[in-house]
Amino acid sequence: MDLDPMLISGKYWKIKLNRYETKARIGAYQHERLLPQRLRLNVSVYVEKGSAPVNELSEVFNYDRIIEAIEVVVQEGHIDLQETLLERTAERLLACPEVAAVQIGSEKPDAYS
């Protein structure tokens, strides 16, 4: 049972993109500045439900917009901290008028391998 307060209200849809992988120049250590590394993100975007059911891609918040927000931030250049990347990505998503809230997390699967 999902006790997510945003969902309990009945006002929002939760759009999830899990385990999205990209390459990013990210990390505070010197060796992390040399090459891009794998970055895995989990993003949930809460969008307000409309008053009528929809069945057209043009009428909903498309997953592609989540990927686009991530990739724009990644392409801006080296980022020292995952928290910075997450904040910038969340800010981009929250700039969309239909987005009420964002949950976002990341991992660098190869950082300690």
Q: Model-predicted segments: where are they?
A:
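N-terminal, polar/charged subdomain of small-to-medium soluble alpha/beta proteins
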Residues: 1-113
